[in-house]
Amino acid sequence: MYTVLSKVYLEVAERLSALIGTSQYYSGAFEIDFEDVSCRMVLSAVIYRHNETLPEGRVVDLIDNIIPVWWEFHTITEEGEVLNDFDFAELKEYLLDK
């Protein structure tokens, strides 16, 4: 079994955040390569947001929650696809604006 490292969660979160942008729904797939493993994320999710005014007066759109409708996380090595311990709850920790 492949153990998903925090560096992988961070890279997936950064890529996903860029793909989500300011949308309230995301449906798509993308791949990342990490060391000797190719990872493929498939996700359909509802994005809950709120606006917050910063001290300097600028308004920012922040993610409150992301609710997956469907998700898959595949890991492929030289030997083919292997099971992994990916946890969507852990990915959310990297995505949610605190």
Regions found by a protein language model. Name each.
Residues 2-29, 54-98:
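Acidic, low-complexity intrinsically disordered segments
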Residues 32-51, 77:
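Beta-strand elements of well-folded, non-transmembrane domains
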